[in-house]
Amino acid sequence: MHGFRYFDGRAIIGFVDGTENPEPVIAAQWALVGNEDPDFIGGSYAFIQKYTHDMEKWRALSDDEQEKVIGRKKFNDIELDDEEKPLTAHNVVSKAHDAEGNELKIMRANMPFSNPSKNEYGTFFIGYSRKFSTTRQMLENMFLGNEQGNLDRLLDFSTAQTGTLFFVPTVDFLDGLGDE
């Protein structure tokens, strides 16, 4: 199995991946632990999942149907208008919000992969977050349903095979381990 960069940052299903990433200038506030946890400041929670895609089933959909699954235009990556976007679209259901309704973000570094000899195609979801609770809320929305009870339609074509949570400490944190 080999991961690779696909065209202009597209997932193997043909859509640009990571379009919801925060701008680089503010990415650290979403991806790195802050003052709320001083022992781990500057580290990050990295959650990695391997998804396989049923490419035959996916390709059986028209571009218009695929766009409704994702919630974006396939070729120009423009988000669909709210009135044409289903409530089960990936970019609707996979969002997380705080108690005041503000959207919470993570940094995604997803990687498409393929193993053609086994007819296996998919995406390694790699998400970095300040708090794992943000990523967890996104996953719960996708798999269990959001507050409105909508599940992520993308999961009709994608199956999570694995999932692992890591804490990625800073170099200073690791250097300090030998001091104790």
Each model region followed by its residue ranges:
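Long, histidine/aromatic-enriched segments associated with O2/redox biology
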Residues: M1-E180
